[in-house]
């Protein structure tokens, strides 16, 4: 989220200007934009057809979050970070159903509170260099992100 807000300072100004009003959509956009899970694999429990492709019970299918969260049929301007995006049917937390992430509400709350405190204490915080990324087949993450800010008085 910090990297996105640093790369799109206009979006940060929108959110910081009406933190409470924009927080619900901003949090969802951070989840869509920076989902830490790369993919999830499942086994089909029955035969299905999806977009003209037949798949049999027992076949393995993979949901690629980065692809689903940039789907042009699902999102208007999917390659734009938009803190007011609504609706935002992202695939974060598994997209719903039996495998929905039990920690989803906690994660949303952590994002909201963390950015609320950053906005309050160091509102001009911004990335100062590219992040060092975590290289993993399953997790899309940032190891370190250098940031800078003006010292509060």
Question: What is the predicted function of each stretch?
Answer:
Residues 1-153:
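Cytochrome P450
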